[in-house]
Design a protein with these regions (language model features):
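Metabolite-binding pocket within alpha/beta catalytic cores that recognizes anionic/polar moieties
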Residues: 2-154
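Non-catalytic positions within long, well-ordered alpha-helices that form the structural scaffold/packing
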Residues: 104-108, 200, 219
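Short acidic/polar active-site loop segments enriched in Thr and Asp
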Residues: 110-111, 205, 224
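Active-site/ligand-binding-proximal alpha/beta "capping" segment
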Residues: 163, 168-205, 263, 270-271
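Zn-dependent metallopeptidase/amidohydrolase metal-coordination segment
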Residues: 209-247
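His/Asp/Glu-rich mid-to-C-terminal helical/loop segments that flank catalytic regions of hydrolases
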Residues: 236-273
Length: 273
């Protein structure tokens, strides 16, 4: 953190002001990971805004991340979907990466669901498995917290109502869902088989390159947070299959209907949780 806190706060407020001018408002935020962005099409009365049209907001450059906000309603609840996210490996600092999340919080959003496509560290979890994040391991080498901010340590365990809402809806809809620890790594390369063995022994169940810093920053801004991973591939060395981003996107698309059914019922409940 090389810039004064006051300057960062002004940057947050500037982006928040630009979001308001774009007509974006919501009660609940949902960040959609690789191959999962199609869920936003389920919203009614949609208002769309490209990240590129919001001055001061970092832009996503990764395939499978459309790079736009879509605001709309589900069951009368105003939802803001972020179709795609930015990552550390795109040359951003932890604070720059979470600037959008903090700005959205200034719009009055009080609950957030962060989703991602992740590599599975368990051989028994086939691609397409959904996992609710119950804890995380941050191996990204930094924190998004500003000087003077404190974190609760595990943002995914502090709001039991959100986790219970996900579990309840999954049971009602007959959607199988696992629970586990998400390990965040810097990327952009996939892990080696040796690293995968280490992460599994470390207590991880899924590995990816996002989500953790966003969740920490969202909690610092006063939002209740929850996380969902779509296991899109076995991590390196668990099977003989080669890893590719194309596979990640394809499995995400295949799981989209089941994933979308879960989100469609869960997100309105977040407004009351």
């Amino acid at each position: 953190m090389t810039e004064p806190v006051q300057l960062w706060q002004r940057r947050i407020e500037s982006v928040a002001s630009n979001l308001r001018e774009a007509g974006l408002s919501a009660e609940v935020l949902c960040v959609l990971g690789s191959g999962l962005g199609g869920f936003a099409d389920r919203l009614e009365d949609r208002v769309e805004c490209s990240y590129a049209d919001v001055e001061g907001l970092p832009r996503s450059s990764v395939p499978g991340h459309a790079g736009r906000f879509v605001a709309g309603t589900l069951d009368g609840v105003r939802i803001l979907c972020a179709q795609g996210r930015v990552h550390l490996y795109e040359g951003l600092s932890p604070f720059e990466l979470t600037l959008g999340v903090r700005a959205v919080a200034r719009l009055g959003v009080r609950a957030a669901l962060f989703t991602n496509a992740a590599g599975g560290l368990r051989s028994e979890w086939e691609p397409g498995t959904l996992m609710r994040i119950t804890d995380h391991v941050n191996r990204q080498g930094g924190s998004p917290l500003l000087p003077g901010e404190g974190g609760a340590g595990n943002p995914w365990a502090t709001e039991a109502g959100l986790g219970e809402a996900i579990d309840s809806v999954a049971e009602e809809r007959g959607i199988a869902i696992q629970r586990g620890v998400y390990v965040a790594v810097p990327g952009p390369s996939y892990e080696t088989p040796a690293e995968v063995r280490f992460l599994r022994e470390f207590g991880g169940d899924a590995v990816g390159m996002s989500t953790v810093l966003e969740g920490v920053a969202a909690q610092a801004e006063g939002m209740a947070v929850a996380g969902l991973s779509c296991i899109t591939n076995h991590a390196a060395g668990i099977t003989a299959a080669a890893l590719s981003h194309a596979e990640v996107l394809e499995v995400g698309r295949q799981a989209a209907a089941r994933f979308g059914d879960l989100l469609e019922a869960v997100l309105p409940r977040f407004a009351q949780a």
